[in-house]
Amino acid sequence: MKKRGPLLAAFCIPLLITLIICVNREIYPFGDQCMLHIDMYHQYCPFFTELMEKLKTGGSTFYSWNIGLGADFVSLYAYYLASPLNWLLILWPRGYVIEFMTALSILKIALSGLTFTYYLGEHFLVWQDAGNAAA
């Protein structure tokens, strides 16, 4: 019970800060700007698009002719796309990969706050100390 408050705050605070930045910088859906720049736009976005197509159409996951002059998709997946959160692409409509990547970046920032707070609590036994102090 005592874990929920800090964990919820550790998720919500980075989420709110990131959303405030998106509003301030007019990043979609709060404006017409995009969070993707340079490599994220020119490299990751085509990789995510190809992953979406493979997940939705059942295409071969071993090789892709749609990336450059063709590429080994297994190594590309292992290096760039292996996050389990990327599988949320299945739920996203085609044509909105950039918007998905923006939402995914915001979610990952919030989850990093949550998981790091959980790690600190377990590693330094903060949860146990809070329980002993109450007893």
PLM regions and their residue ranges:
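Start-transfer (signal-anchor) and selected internal transmembrane alpha helices
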Residues: 1-27
